[in-house]
Curated annotation (Swiss-Prot):
Gene: acsA
Name this polypeptide is given: Acetyl-coenzyme A synthetase
Record-listed ATP binding positions: G387, E388, P389, D411, T412, W413, W414, Q415, T416, D501, R516, R527
Modified residues (N6-acetyllysine): K610
Membrane-spanning intervals of the chain: none
Amino acid sequence: MSEAHIYPVKENIKAHTHADNDTYLAMYQQSVTDPERFWSEHGKIVDWIKPFTKVKQTSFDTGHVDIRWFEDGTLNVSANCIDRHLAERGDDVAIIWEGDNPEDDKTLTYNELYTEVCRFSNALKEQGVRKGDVVCLYMPMVPEAAVAMLACTRIGAVHTIVFGGFSPEALAGRIIDSDAKVVITADEGVRGGRAVPLKKNVDEALTNPEVKTISKVVVFKRTGGNIDWHEHRDVWWHEATAKVSDVCPPEEMKAEDPLFILYTSGSTGKPKGVLHTTGGYLVYATMTFKYVFDYQPGETFWCTADVGWITGHTYLVYGPLANGAKTILFEGVPNYPNTSRMSEVVDKHQVNILYTAPTAIRALMAKGNEAIEGTDRSSLRIMGSVGEPINPEAWEWYYKTIGNEKSPIVDTWWQTETGGILITPLPGATALKPGSATRPFFGVQPALVDNMGNVIEDQAAEGNLVILDSWPGQMRTVYGDHERFEQTYFSTFKGMYFTGDGARRDEDGYYWITGRVDDVLNVSGHRMGTAEIESALVAHPKIAEAAIVGIPHDIKGQAIYAYVTLNAGEYPTAELHKEVKDWVRKEIGPIATPDVLHWTDALPKTRSGKIMRRILRKIATGDTSNLGDTSTLADPSVVDKLIAEKAELV
């Protein structure tokens, strides 16, 4: 691969930072050699009702996996995100809402957020919600989504958010698994100029005979569209909040009380309910937000994720608000009504920190300068990437085109299961290499192991990425199935948390995520991460996006099957076919040359923008009779089109 360029820490960032390199090294050293002392001190980043005296009781031992942090302390999440800021910054903006339509926006100050959250907390109590009950949110990206989350935490209810794009079947499955008591939804959502039938989907989900626990559906009026109404079950948000008090004392919660359940699709079978608890999660969300984004008071932070994903939980709602930040909640999509929408929002709200996904970056990159037309983005100070490894070409484009070569990029690696960011640069401390997530955050001990579970001690190495010890934000269990938790994360490599990802570590100790371990190809005895070949393909000037899967090959073991999407205005030709193969040969070597090039207009993606490689593997091998769980697909029609194209390739 082409040698990565190194971007040193910028002097202006270093001058006003929470952690320069010396500070990072000292803090990191303490965090791994004396985690008790480190987290005893930094656990105080949040306000405790009853201070903790126990810091860490954790075990990764087979049959005894047990994770507890700060367990004798008590606190309340909503009080940390709202109440503690009221005296000093009650009139400061907490949430900026930017609607799908660029003309729609509004703000909520911390004082206003307090009132809204207290009201809705009391409304939930009126609907019979008690401490420990599960509340399911199926909401559009409106401020009320954050209000509902915070209200649940205020009264000690456990929220489970289902992304508003999921089908009624997927919603029903999550309601059944979580035993939710109440659903909070809207009449309709709005996304990319189209209405999303949220209430209709809830009605349909609740016709499933297995759904037995729902007593009420609270409906926020977003569009005023026509909906069916069930008199004894359905309640309007505005009516429920009109007649209640706007004072609601926060419930005192134990650190290990459940905070939320968030479902991730397992590659087989039913989705896993990832359970996070109150104290450790909030400490870790607060700490990572402060240091990773180097947040300074008064700055405007924009995480483009939906609240239905872990990124939306941790870095749109809880992390920013616990730090008293100003956070943007965006209803729309980055390219509607035009390609420069993301840049326009940055200018309109003078965004200082932007956190988005490689999928969005690549989609904008394919449109070239249209993505920044009529904007200057001069307010940006820090930019971030999340969701999957970002290929160096997209990193460079993001850095130069969106960020004007002024803003360091924090390429963050983490998972739903980890609660917060685990491997990341710190803006004032870390020299950057495009495509590398760089170094571990405080308290995180990554290691690379071979397939037998032996830790690879060499500095420069490649292997399976594991974490050797617990950190406060770690998930505690799979809801209702602790055995599945142990089986999934701790049985592959004994005594270690297995991330499911492969990585390489370079001579500077920087980590490069190579993709899911099941995305590792073995071609003629050579192990290759699919991410590396995809990066080489996307570096070609005519290619917008690529996905690589392995297919069985009689001689080589595996052959390389490449799905390739071209930039707007480019079309597949025999010349381009040869050119692309030669390009990969030059970038990586003959061993990485794709055996099959499958040109296509679109790849199957989850609604959070991840490419569903499992489906691509099945299509490539012709095994399309059972595609498994496809409920998370953004556009299921893409799959049929790919199957038809594959038939023509043969």
